[in-house]
Regions:
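Histidine-rich, glycine-flanked metal-binding segment
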Residues: 29, 36-38, 51, 55-95, ...
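Metal-coordinating catalytic core of metallo-dependent amide/deamination hydrolases
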Residues: 21, 26, 30-35, 168-193
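Metal-associated gating/positioning segment near the N- to mid-region
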Residues: 92-158, 162-166
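Conserved N-terminal strand/loop that marks the beginning of ABC ATPase nucleotide-binding domains
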Residues: 42-49
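Sec/Tat signal peptide C-region and signal peptidase I cleavage site
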Residues: 16-19
C-alpha cells in the first residue's frame, strides 16, 4: 500500500510540475514577437554640442559618435571615421531619447476619428484580456510628431475606461508597416490599472 501511495504521489508531482511549466510558458512566450530590425546607417559624429548624458553629466563643446543609430561614444574631440557624416551642433543641445511610459499613440490615432479609436474595451470594469498591441495603427501621424519632440520609445497602454484596462506594449518609435516592426525586442508587457 505504501508503495502505491508513493507512486501516486510521485506521479502527481511530475504532472503538476509539467502543468505549471506549461502555464508559465503560456504567459512568457510572445505569440506576436517583435520583427524590429535596426536600420543600417553609417557613422555620424555630432560635434560641438552641449551634451546631456542622462546620468546628470553635462558635456560642454561635446561630441557624440553614432554607429547604426546607436551612441558608441560621448566626449570631447572624438575622432570621426573617414566615412562619417559630421554635423556641427554649435549652440545646440543633444540629449538621450525620451521614453513615454504612458502613451495612447496608435490606439487613439490622429486625426481622431471613430474608426481609429481603439483604446478602450468599455464592456466591463475588468478587461485584462485586452492587448493594446492589437489596436496600434503604426501609421498614426502622432508617432512622427512625438519623434520630432525626441520621443524614441513608448509604452502604449489601453485607455482608462476600466479599473483594469488590459496589457500595454513597448514600442520603438520607428516607421513600420506593422506594430510588430515597432515592438521593442524583449521588453516586458505593462498592465493598465
Amino acid at each position: 500500500m505504501r508503495l502505491v501511495l508513493l507512486a501516486v504521489a510521485g506521479l502527481a508531482s511530475v504532472c503538476s510540475s509539467a502543468d505549471a511549466a506549461t502555464a508559465r510558458s503560456r504567459f512568457t512566450q510572445d505569440p506576436y514577437p517583435s520583427t524590429y530590425r535596426a536600420i543600417a546607417a553609417g557613422p555620424v559624429l555630432i560635434r560641438h554640442a552641449t551634451v546631456l548624458t542622462g546620468t546628470g553629466e553635462r558635456v560642454e563643446d561635446g561630441d557624440v559618435l553614432l554607429q547604426d543609430g546607436k551612441v558608441v561614444a560621448v566626449g570631447r574631440s572624438l575622432e570621426a571615421p573617414a566615412d562619417a557624416t559630421v554635423i556641427d551642433a554649435t549652440g545646440r543641445w543633444v540629449t538621450p531619447g525620451l521614453i513615454d511610459v504612458h502613451s495612447h499613440l496608435g490606439v487613439y490615432s490622429s486625426p481622431g476619428v471613430n474608426a481609429h479609436s481603439d483604446g478602450n474595451e468599455a464592456t466591463a470594469p475588468v478587461t485584462a484580456n485586452v492587448w493594446a498591441e492589437h489596436s496600434v495603427w503604426p501609421q498614426d501621424p502622432g508617432f512622427h510628431t512625438a519623434l520630432a519632440g525626441g520621443v524614441t520609445s513608448l509604452q502604449v497602454l489601453p485607455g482608462s475606461a476600466n479599473l483594469v484596462g488590459g496589457r500595454g506594449v513597448t514600442l520603438k518609435n520607428v516607421p513600420a508597416t506593422t506594430y510588430q516592426g515597432m515592438k521593442f525586442p524583449g521588453a516586458p508587457w505593462g498592465l493598465k490599472m
